From Swiss-Prot:
GO terms for cellular component: cytoplasmic vesicle membrane; phagocytic vesicle; SNARE complex. It is found in: Cytoplasmic vesicle membrane. Pfam families: SNAP. Interacts with nsfA and probably SNARE proteins. GO terms for biological process: intracellular protein transport; vesicle-mediated transport. The lineage of its organism: Eukaryota, Amoebozoa, Evosea, Eumycetozoa, Dictyostelia. Keywords: Cytoplasmic vesicle, ER-Golgi transport, Membrane, Protein transport, Transport. SUPFAM superfamilies: TPR-like (SSF48452). This is Gamma-soluble NSF attachment protein. It comes from Dictyostelium discoideum. Residues 285-324 are annotated as: Disordered. GO terms for molecular function: soluble NSF attachment protein activity; syntaxin binding. InterPro entries: NSF_attach, TPR-like_helical_dom_sf. Its main location: membrane. Belongs to the SNAP family.
Length: 324
């Protein structure tokens, strides 16, 4: 854009912005704001400033436009204007402000009953906040997944679910990841995506075993038997064998099972967990990043047995003394 055209757009924007400010305020002669006319003025001003790349003024006008539209009870348009204001904040490198405005837009979408748009906007805000506030990012992504499922927009929820679960696992929030996988299973059932359902079920059981909770893994396995296709699937068979191996403290069995190619088709984070899954030499329970070999496990068992045998003569001697 030439300097002359940019100057003209700036002048145009300033003119309409002043008009919008005037119409949206009351005075001694105007007891009620003219929101309709103010909205038209702010929209023209915002577009003019945006064309001239005067982003701070454009952001102000989009915010005022959203306010006008809220007073006019057109919440969908108010949400779109708030999104535009967020885009201007992004141009200004105001990351936190950009995310905050997206969340305000999300509220307006939800007020209007647009859960899908709210979830999509929430996902955008979460991505911006990942390096600023991890906990808020995870909460926003989780809420977005729930909104997608609530609005029956299951076909559009896959990427958000995948991104959120992967992030939860990356930051070792295993309980939250499992909860979200259980929610995602409902989506897979609705969409009749049995293959993805089976992978999700195996992932849940793998993570449960990795967090020392064999009881939970058994509970989940019983729950997943409600899916008729799971028990006959390769994932279902693998899950059952893995639980049995842990139940029997079969170190070699666990190593052989987790080395199967099937785990490579799970989420990358789950595949990493599965690769390092083994039985702890100390507690005989599954642990993440445990590398206890079978020989150590055998030595531990032998030591325990020997200690028990060594204690028996002493106990017998005490008993004999009591009799005497």
């Amino acid at each position: 854009m030439s300097d002359k055209l940019k100057s003209n757009k700036k002048l145009e924007g300033e003119t309409f912005m002043k008009e919008g400010d005037k119409l949206s305020k009351t005075n001694i002669f105007r007891w009620k704001a003219d929101w309709d006319s103010a909205a038209l003025a702010y929209e023209k001003a915002a577009n003019a400033f945006r064309s001239a790349k005067i982003y701070d003024s454009a952001k102000y006008c989009f915010l005022r436009l959203s306010l006008c539209q809220t007073h006019m009870d057109v919440y969908y348009l108010a949400a779109k204007s708030m999104e535009n204001a967020s885009a201007m904040a992004k141009e200004l490198k105001e990351t936190q402000e950009c995310a905050n405005l997206l969340l305000e837009s999300c509220k307006l979408y939800r007020t209007n009953g647009n859960s899908f748009q709210a979830a999509d906007t929430m996902t955008k805000a979460a991505k911006l906040l990942e390096d600023i506030d991890l906990n808020q990012t995870i909460k926003l992504l989780t809420d977005a997944c729930e909104l997608f499922e609530l609005d029956d927009k299951d076909h559009f929820s896959g990427d958000t679910f995948k991104q959120t679960i992967s992030m939860l696992l990356k930051h070792k929030k295993y309980t939250e990841a499992v909860d979200l996988m259980i929610l995602q299973n409902r989506v897979f059932v609705k969409l009749e995506q049995n293959h993805d359902l089976h992978k999700s079920c195996l992932s849940v059981i793998t993570i449960s075993l990795a967090t020392d909770d064999i009881v939970a893994s058994k509970k989940y396995y019983e729950q997943f038997l409600d899916y008729p296709s799971f028990i006959h699937s390769q994932e279902g068979t693998t899950a059952q064998e893995l639980i049995t191996a842990f139940d029997n403290h079969d170190v070699d069995g666990v190593k052989k099972i987790v080395s199967r190619h099937i785990f490579n088709f799970l989420d990358n984070q789950v595949a990493k967990i599965a690769k390092n899954l083994s039985i702890s030499k100390d507690s005989l329970n599954p642990t993440i990043n445990s590398t206890a070999p079978q020989q150590q496990y055998s030595n531990t068992t032998t030591t325990t047995t020997n200690n028990t045998n060594n204690n028996n003569p002493t106990s017998q001697q005490d008993d004999d003394e009591d009799v005497l």
